[in-house]
């Protein structure tokens, strides 16, 4: 066999192997379910209607003895922004839901489907934990993942059993230490937007795409049991989108003392009483992305 012929054969074989390996990596990242864990029985929903008898419901509000939700829409920076003001009688009504009621990579469903599964009243997409194999994950008191993130700053949102919020840095505390303090939820997307009533990001904050205008999603606390859910549209002719600094300002203007950035872009979705409130997009077209998890309000 001549050297030239050998080189051609080797090139073909190498190309086939490289293509197969690339396909496997993409499938492992986006398609193949991995490390699947069923949600603990105590965290599963009952499958009954979450709305209380006698609840007063409109297109933009819900009120019963335990939950009060009011949704408003405003224009900010040439963008439609949807703001849900939530007041609860108990922190247990603020919950997290997993797609298909399972934890694992590539276990996905739309925010709408997971909200229906959980019998939610109000829901937004979560931190899309399944897109990464690192970052602390706790849902409804169950600690699923304890692997620290790789970045210098990995800010998590911790929600405690009394309804208080805290921004925690994974480099400074373990997931087990957070759990021991009474945490019930840990989200690991970030960054934090507001802490102690002070905006913690600005236009120069170095986060991938942070200074670009995108659809956004955030959750904040005014005080324990009083929360704000925010989703903005973006990437359309009608709505430009927000940068992180813009999003932080929206949360401050809503009265938040603590606020945290959740997964945005095509994931950004707000759902209320069976309907998507905002305009989620992919490639400029209406499309509700399938994601790993949601944050929601429910009985």
Please annotate each region the language model reported.
Residues 133-151, 204-257, 262, 267-299:
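Conserved, well-ordered active-site substructure
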Residues 122-126, 159, 167, 258-262:
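General beta-strand structural signal in soluble alpha/beta enzymes
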Residues 62, 129-210:
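Active-site-adjacent helix-turn-beta-strand microarchitecture at beta-sheet edges
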Residues 79, 91, 164, 221-228:
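Beta-strand-turn-beta hairpins that frame and shape the catalytic cleft
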Residues 99-103, 171-175, 232-236:
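Short, solvent-exposed aromatic-acidic interface loops
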Residues 2-150, 166:
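Zymogen propeptides
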Residues 79-81, 117-118, 152, 188, ...:
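Extracytoplasmic
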Residues 85-87, 124-126, 160, 220, ...:
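Short beta-strand segments
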């Amino acid at each position: 066999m001549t050297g030239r012929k050998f080189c051609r054969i080797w090139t073909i074989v190498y190309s086939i192997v490289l293509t197969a390996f690339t396909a496997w990596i993409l499938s492992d990242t986006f398609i193949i379910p991995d490390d699947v864990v069923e949600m603990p029985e105590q965290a599963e929903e009952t499958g009954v209607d979450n709305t209380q008898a006698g609840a007063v419901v409109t297109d933009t509000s819900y009120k019963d003895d335990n939950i009060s939700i009011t949704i408003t829409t405003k224009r900010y920076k040439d963008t439609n922004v949807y703001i849900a003001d939530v007041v609860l009688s108990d922190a247990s009504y603020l919950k997290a839901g997993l797609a298909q009621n399972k934890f694992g990579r590539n276990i996905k469903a739309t925010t709408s489907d997971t909200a229906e599964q959980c019998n939610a009243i109000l829901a937004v997409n979560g931190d899309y934990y399944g897109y990464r194999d690192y970052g602390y994950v706790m849902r409804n008191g169950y600690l699923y993942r304890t692997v620290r993130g790789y970045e210098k700053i990995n800010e998590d949102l911790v929600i405690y059993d009394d309804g208080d919020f805290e921004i925690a840095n994974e480099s400074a505390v373990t997931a087990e230490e957070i759990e021991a303090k009474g945490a019930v939820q840990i989200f690991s997307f970030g960054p934090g937007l507001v802490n102690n009533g002070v905006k913690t990001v600005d236009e120069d904050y170095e986060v991938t795409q942070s200074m670009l205008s995108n659809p956004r999603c955030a959750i904040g606390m005014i005080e324990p049991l009083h929360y704000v859910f925010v989703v903005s549209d973006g990437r359309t002719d009608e709505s430009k989108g927000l940068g992180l600094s813009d999003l932080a300002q929206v949360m401050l203007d809503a009265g938040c003392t603590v606020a945290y950035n959740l997964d945005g872009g095509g994931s950004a979705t707000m759902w209320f009483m069976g309907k998507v409130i905002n305009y989620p997009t992919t490639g400029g077209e209406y499309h509700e992305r399938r994601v790993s998890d949601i944050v929601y309000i429910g009985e």
